[in-house]
Amino acid sequence: MADVFADGAGVAGGCCVGLSWAHRVGGVTTDDTVTTDDPRDARSVRLTAGDAELTVLPDNGCRIGSLRVGGTELLRQGAAFGSFPMVPWCGRVELGVFRDGAERHQLPVNAPPHAIHGTGRDTAWRTAHAEAASASFTYDLAEPWPYPGRVTQVFELAPDALTLSMGVETIDDSFPAQAGWHPWFLRNLGRGGEDVRIDFSADWQEERGEDHLPTGRRIAPLPGPWDDCFGMSDGVDVTLTWPGELELKVTSRSEWVVIYDHQPEAVCVEPQSGPPNGLNTLPRLVTPIDPLEISTTWRWRTLD
């Protein structure tokens, strides 16, 4: 589940991923050719397409620092800002513990009493490739995650859309993993318009217990406010509308999305490869021949 405090502290299939993803979008450049100044990160990569501008901060967990369309910022700025990758798990892991067969693993408890949102957001990523409207980044899985592997994240910007892709691969033993994104979309775009509206049709809602973890029961979707995981059998499809200003659709082939709207300045629509605590309840194994892959597209159009 999303957590307003955690940020400030935070689809299976396809062929091999890792650096091969970078090769799909072009050759590798050096970091120096793609850096610009940013107050939160000495090394930022900026992509442009039409009037859309994206800033990626590889040293700050490879999060999106800014997404501007026609000069208007769409993502919250400040302590909990932008959009960060959730990897190698999404949401909360109960008491920070997961099991892989007979092996028991303890993760850092960074949202007591649970572990939340993975380690990728706390890690500096390497720039594998960057050009005007696309870039790819990697980092190697290491302690406190107990298995070696590699994560690749690809950004592809168009004048009316942003496509994000992420892959997790093992370089040794198989292991369970999840991946997804945690964007902080501005509730109000600050141009005198109305607050955002969130529209979606879910097949089920993961019932949330008092410990903020799914109980294991799937229930009929409830009205908001939400800090909840929803299931969409045909893939994630959520529309954010700032009336008279902008419409943005978040889509993904993945079935799960967490929606969070408790924060006064932002809302979260988080496509992810499995439900919270899924390392325990719905483990998806990453194997040498079957990496984990997930992607999401954010497509927008102006309404004014």
Task: Please report, for each region that a protein language model flagged, where it lies by residue.
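Acidic, contiguous internal or C-terminal segments within carbohydrate-active enzymes
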Residues: 54, 58, 139-183, 188-190
